[in-house]
A protein has these predicted regions:
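An internal, D/E-rich "acidic patch" concept
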Residues: 2-5, 65-122
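Hydrophobic alpha-helical transmembrane segments of membrane transport/permease proteins
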Residues: 22-73, 163-186
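Short amphipathic alpha-helical coupling elements at transmembrane boundaries
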Residues: 10, 47, 57-60, 74, ...
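Transmembrane helix-loop junction
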Residues: 35, 48, 126-130, 161, ...
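Short helix-capping/hinge motifs at transmembrane helix termini and TM-loop junctions
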Residues: 37-39, 89, 128-133, 163-168, ...
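Alpha-helical transmembrane segments of integral membrane proteins
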Residues: 6-11, 99, 103-136, 152, ...
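Membrane-water interface segments at the C-terminal ends of transmembrane alpha-helices
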Residues: 29-36, 66, 74-77, 142-171, ...
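N-terminal signal-anchor/signal peptide hydrophobic helix marking the start
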Residues: 13-23
């Protein structure tokens, strides 16, 4: 319990410390690759009818003639101040506005997918461990492998084809506080598509952790002393075995987003 929470908090802390370095590294790599493109941004923005003077004016206005490091430094400075640039050639649509618009729905979808993953994978993993090498374990392991190998985008397309006309697959998302039923129905299919691969992985992680804990000496000693196995599992094994799955689950939050 408390140990699992502490491990998760330490993991989150390490990730937060590493996040700025990762952002700078990834942004530098992407910026460098984009700079190697033979396509002239000014030509793409202004089109074929643009005069050489107009193209040059566009390059000067947007700093495209500056050295690469100067351009990247300007981009990084703007990014640190919340300006991520624009999207769409020749438009003034800000990426920051796009992210701000999509982030609330992304967080809601992540939460629901995470909830599905926890409610399904943890009981399945525990059940598989308790029936190790018997048919429930074998069936659960087969389905977990299938889940791990199922691409979310492919499953999402299948769900849309299978449930079109039965569940809403398009249209605006109502606010949860206004229409919780409508919100859940519109979130259901994408949340399932996101959760299935995580369910497959987490089921295996929970099973492995439970099996390792069930094989420990204190479990055999307690059962040998006459304590019912279900009591040992409920009071000790579950608490100790869930430390690793909770940590791994924290890592999967980024995948769900």
């Amino acid at each position: 319990g408390g140990l699992a929470v502490n491990n998760l908090l330490r993991l989150i802390g390490r990730r937060l410390v590493a996040l700025p370095i990762m952002v700078v590294g990834v942004s530098f790599l992407v910026f460098f690759i984009m700079s190697l493109s033979p396509i002239d941004p000014a030509y793409s923005a202004l089109g074929e009818t643009a005069t050489p003077e107009a193209l040059e004016e566009y390059r000067v206005q947007h700093g495209l003639n500056d050295p690469f490091l100067v351009q990247y430094g300007r981009y990084l400075w703007n990014m640190l101040h919340g300006d991520l640039g624009t999207y769409g050639v020749g438009t003034s649509n800000h990426v920051t506005d796009l992210v701000a618009k999509a982030l609330p729905i992304t967080l809601q979808l992540t939460f629901l997918g995470l909830l599905f993953a926890v409610l399904i994978s943890f009981p399945l993993g525990v059940l598989a461990a308790l029936y190790r090498d018997r048919w429930p374990d074998q069936v659960i392991r087969i389905f977990s492998v299938i889940g791990i190998g199922t691409p979310s985008f492919w499953l999402a397309a299948l769900l849309v084809l299978g449930f079109v006309g039965k569940l809403p697959v398009s249209g605006p998302l109502p606010a949860f506080t206004v229409d919780p039923g409508g919100w859940f129905l519109r979130m259901l299919l994408p949340a399932i598509a996101l959760a299935v691969p995580v369910i497959g992985q987490m089921t295996r992680v929970v099973r492995t952790s439970m099996v390792e804990e069930l094989d420990r000496d204190y479990v055999r000693t307690a059962i040998g002393a006459g304590i019912p196995k279900r009591i040992v599992v409920a009071r000790n094994v579950l608490r100790n075995a869930l430390i690793t799955p909770v940590t791994v689950l924290g890592l999967r939050i980024g995948y769900l987003m």
